[in-house]
């Protein structure tokens, strides 16, 4: 199968937005106009193509980032009538699913940032924007819902500038706003575009309406000044009053978008079919192809020596698995991005992280959840493979003869957990397998068991996250389960540095056990997890026993000394020890490591940590005092407040333990007129009174 379009004509994009900005509807319209869809799906009637899980259709929110592909020939600009392939990853807007956004952004080249013309920049827009900044993803802005009462394109653009610190440059302005939204003025061509009232997909080009001439000139000057600032040749022409051509404006706008210095801003109403075609033209015109993004870097599996791969079919194959999904018909699907080379169906790939070779049974390109078989996939493609058994999210797939490890994805730790138990014996057998499959798909979902109670615990990023997963157990895996009350995922760490000896000796006739280790424990900065340093000199602890010492320490870290919670952010250095020729074994050194760590942790000023959430509440002014008082009573710290879109907002840092059931309280406190978002911020030390209560509750089970 030959390549359908050249690599320079491929666009890998995501549509990123706050929940309710019209993201799924916009994606539906893209598929409709590019000929992939014959009937438009609406989110509010549960018919949207990209929202393919049952819960998504019911809740009207997108949970999993489905990937789809389509073709588009721009109707104007520097790429007019050239066939392009657009691969779209639809990303969720709900804060509990930020992991989906994170992994999508990792494999994208560009993004369309969607904003609501009424709400402007919402809290989740900020979260997603920060994630996109982290990966330096070039963006265009599309202000949607221009037909809504209260729509204000200029206020939305101002909010993008002020709240996101970006440089949005309108390349269109609206003709009418709200119910009288009729079309746009194209500032590059200085023409008016009026959409057909009924359909919106047809339009006519007109002269700029008389009452908008002054405004259009003002915004065209704004655009020309913005592009002149990033290009010296254009600046000279502009200052000397020479004409700047359309092609020149587009070329410099493209360069500035690719380097992140400008965000071209457009507007429309996806629901009313107005503006989507011009947004597609802008995707082609301003967002990068894999060629623009350039080489991807990684390292050799055996060492840290750097390797790069050019985006070319002639390079060795390298791809990144960014999502695992279970398909009811073909089983496990591994979504991956091809960075270089060609991969054929039926061939073998190396998982560079595990060292295992696996056969790719089938290759598919997805249109939402419909599949199209492919004989081969090429550099720049996003596709799904069937038949890969041991691949996890973030693994590198590559040519076995030319291995490379691409940068891994880092996912946040879960902050909330609940106990789950099967309703019947039949469910019991299926529960473990089903939970395992869900954990494979979602790196922020963890399954563990409480050794004392024997309960199965599931952990995730929020109440909605776990609710959706329990719902999937029932629908997809036909497993009925009861769930307990949500529990906070507390952690422990140390504040001091100490040295300690761990000794395990058993002499009871015959072969005994002997292991002695001297370790130093010290705190690491938050989020670093665990670090082990082997500083043994002269073989006082034989090399073969050193991994066992680390294993024993990690075992002990699962059960901290304050209240039995997992320990994090600790560095342990093994610097001395003793062994016995006959009695020493891996087991004796593992136990010595465990004893040593427990003893050291007790002396190293151990503390209990709790997850702190970043909470933002948007409320009518009359409830502001009540909302702030309530947040303070929840041990919250008010970080800021202000006005947005006619309402007040409050930002606060609040312990997760105090936020269960908050939505119900907020609803009754404000007659349902306020809403809030919440995301994990950091782990902080628990106040003494709370720590004592938790210790009492746990019976300080870790202190034995």
From Swiss-Prot:
One MF term in the entry's GO annotations: GTP binding
Main location per the UniProt record: cytoplasm
Keyword hit for Cell cycle: no
Keyword Nucleotide-binding: yes
Domain of life: Bacteria
A Pfam family of this chain: GTP_EFTU
SUPFAM superfamilies per the UniProt record, alphabetical: EF-G C-terminal domain-like (SSF54980), P-loop containing nucleoside triphosphate hydrolases (SSF52540), Ribosomal protein S5 domain 2-like (SSF54211), Translation proteins (SSF50447)
One example of a Gene Ontology biological process annotation: ribosome disassembly
Any one annotated GO CC term: cytoplasm
Residue ranges occupied by any tr-type G domain in the UniProt entry: 8-291
InterPro entries: EFG_II (IPR041095), EFG_III (IPR009022), EFG_III/V (IPR035647), EFG_IV (IPR047872), EFG_V (IPR035649), EFG_V-like (IPR000640), EFTu-like_2 (IPR004161), G_TR_CS (IPR031157)
Subcellular location: Cytoplasm
Keywords: Cytoplasm, Elongation factor, GTP-binding, Nucleotide-binding, Protein biosynthesis
Similarity remark: Belongs to the TRAFAC class translation factor GTPase superfamily. Classic translation factor GTPase family. EF-G/EF-2 subfamily.
Entries under NCBIfam families matching the protein: EF-G, PRK12740.1-5, small_GTP
Task of the protein: Catalyzes the GTP-dependent ribosomal translocation step during translation elongation. During this step, the ribosome changes from the pre-translocational (PRE) to the post-translocational (POST) state as the newly formed A-site-bound peptidyl-tRNA and P-site-bound deacylated tRNA move to the P and E sites, respectively. Catalyzes the coordinated movement of the two tRNA molecules, the mRNA and conformational changes in the ribosome.
This protein's name: Elongation factor G
Species, as recorded: Chlorobium phaeobacteroides (strain BS1)
Lineage: Bacteria, Pseudomonadati, Chlorobiota, Chlorobiia, Chlorobiales
């Amino acid at each position: 199968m030959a390549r359908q379009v050249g690599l320079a004509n491929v666009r890998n994009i995501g549509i990123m937005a706050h929940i309710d900005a019209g993201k799924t509807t916009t994606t539906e319209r893209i598929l409709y106009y590019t000929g992939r869809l014959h009937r438009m799906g609406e989110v509010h009637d549960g018919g949207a193509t990209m929202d393919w899980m049952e819960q998504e259709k019911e809740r009207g929110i997108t949970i999993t980032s489905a990937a789809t592909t389509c073709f588009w020939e721009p109707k104007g600009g520097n790429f007019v009538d050239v066939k392009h392939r657009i691969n779209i990853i639809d990303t969720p807007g709900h804060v509990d699913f930020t992991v989906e956004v994170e992994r999508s952004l990792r494999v994208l080249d560009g993004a369309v940032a969607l904003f609501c013309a009424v709400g402007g920049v919402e809290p989740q827009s900020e979260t997603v924007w920060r994630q996109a900044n982290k990966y330096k993803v070039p963006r265009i802005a599309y202000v949607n819902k221009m037909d809504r009462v209260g729509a204000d394109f200029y206020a939305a653009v101002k909010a993008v500038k002020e709240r996101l610190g970006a440089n949005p440059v309108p390349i269109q302005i609206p003709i009418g706003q709200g119910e009288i939204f009729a079309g746009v003025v194209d500032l590059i061509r200085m023409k008016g575009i009026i959409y057909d009232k009924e359909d919106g997909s047809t339009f006519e080009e007109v002269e700029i309406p008389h009452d908008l001439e002054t405004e259009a000139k003002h915004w065209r000057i704004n655009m020309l000044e913005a592009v002149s600032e990033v290009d010296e040749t254009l600046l000279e022409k502009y200052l000397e009053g020479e004409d700047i051509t359309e092609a020149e404006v587009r070329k410099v706008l493209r360069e500035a978008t690719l380097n992140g210095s400008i965000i071209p801003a457009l507007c429309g109403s996806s629901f009313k079919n107005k503006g989507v075609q011009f947004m597609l033209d802008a995707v082609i015109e301003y967002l990068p192809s894999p060629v623009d993004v350039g080489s991807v870097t990684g390292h050799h599996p055996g060492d840290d020596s750097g390797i790069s791969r050019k985006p070319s079919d002639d390079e060795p194959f390298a791809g990144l698995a960014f999502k695992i999904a279970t398909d009811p018909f073909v089983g496990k699907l591994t979504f991956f991005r091809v960075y270089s080379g060609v991969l054929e169906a039926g061939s073998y790939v190396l998982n560079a992280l595990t060292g295992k070779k696996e056969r790719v049974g089938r290759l598919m390109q997805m249109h939402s959840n419909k599949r199209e078989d492919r004989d081969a996939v090429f550099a720049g493609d996003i596709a799904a493979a069937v038949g890969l058994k041991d691949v996890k999210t973030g693994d590198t797939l590559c040519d076995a003869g030319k291995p490379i490890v691409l940068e891994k994805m880092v996912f946040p730790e879960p902050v909330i957990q609940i106990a789950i138990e099967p309703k019947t014996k039949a469910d019991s057998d299926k529960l473990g397998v089903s939970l395992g499959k869900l954990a494979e798909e979602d790196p922020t979902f963890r399954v563990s068991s409480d050794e004392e109670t024997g309960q199965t615990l599931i952990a995730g990023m929020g109440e909605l996250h776990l609710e959706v997963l329990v719902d999937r157990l029932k629908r997809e895996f036909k497993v009925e389960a009861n769930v307990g009350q949500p529990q906070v995922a507390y952690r422990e760490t140390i504040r001091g540095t100490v040295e300690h000896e761990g000794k395990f000796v058993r002499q009871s006739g015959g072969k005994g056990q002997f292991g002695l280790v001297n370790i130093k424990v010290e705190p690491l900065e938050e989020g670093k997890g665990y670090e082990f340093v082997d500083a043994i000199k002269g073989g006082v602890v034989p090399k073969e026993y050193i991994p066992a010492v680390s294993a024993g320490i990690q075992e002990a870290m699962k059960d901290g000394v304050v209240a039995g919670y997992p320990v994090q952010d600790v560095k342990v250095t093994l610097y001395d020890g003793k062994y016995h020729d006959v009695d020493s074994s891996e087991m004796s050194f593992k136990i010595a490591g465990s004893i040593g760590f427990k003893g050291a942790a007790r002396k190293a000023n151990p503390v209990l940590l709790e997850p702190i959430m970043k909470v933002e509440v948007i409320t009518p002014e009359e409830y502001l005092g009540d909302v702030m008082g309530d947040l303070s009573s929840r041990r919250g710290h008010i970080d800021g407040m202000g006005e947005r879109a006619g309402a007040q907002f409050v930002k606060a840092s609040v312990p997760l333990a105090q936020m269960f059931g908050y939505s119900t309280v907020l609803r009754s406190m404000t007659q349902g007129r306020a809403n809030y978002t919440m995301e994990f911020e950091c782990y902080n030390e628990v106040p003494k009174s709370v720590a004592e209560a938790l210790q009492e509750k746990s019976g300080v089970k870790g202190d034995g």
